């Protein structure tokens, strides 16, 4: 059963007074990200949520859905030719040039490790013929997954009117992504080196810095724009299973990493039956957002900046 917590000073005082067992829950409810969800990767069960259905900008976590749709339509060994539109995508990018020959696998590495926007556009054109048609496929995939509060307008996450996601939906997309061995490998890669096919070698570092500091965090995807702030979806292997953490709208990158690790720890406690699952709502956010509530009670379900990281 879920506890639903609405933030208020009186309620917080009562919670602190009621039970020592609630200390961790109160701590987690004070996270600074605007929305967060912790999910059991095996079942889809939500272990903790703050504003899970609040629609926010996804930034480059969008590229997780891009990867899912591409893998449904293309073989990773397929070669595509980079278009002028893809090569002209704004930063962050790897510097693709019009006419470059490049494999789908290389583009996936660039989009997910470096968070390259040019690679994301090239992937969309390779998979659907045009960026616009690919976006339609992304939204159809979201509907098929039951993601009621997600809508994409591009494959890279750059800001635009009508593009949004929720922490719950982002966690579910991450859960789907790690079912692909190739995506698990890419999202857990610290450093990658690849060629564009014209003799140009590119070395990229993963934007997910937890890969260097948390041995149990096996993969993840960052996101940042000025509008979206700092975002992240990641998966961590714990003794009790794999835990998904999704955060949107964190004030800073260091805080994003700290809250990811804190929520991983909380999720582990819930899986170990040391805490109850909690849905935590910040009233001011819900008063100003139109959301479709998700029924959480029924849901089971290698390590080697304007920017969209």
Question: Locations of the language-model features?
Answer:
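Context-gated lysine
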Residues: 3, 7, 32, 50, ...
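Domain-terminus/edge residues, biased toward the C-terminal soluble/receptor-binding domains
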Residues: 148-151, 159-309
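Intrinsically disordered, low-complexity regions
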Residues: 19, 89, 100, 130, ...
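N-terminal secretory targeting signals
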Residues: 1-35, 39-47, 269-309
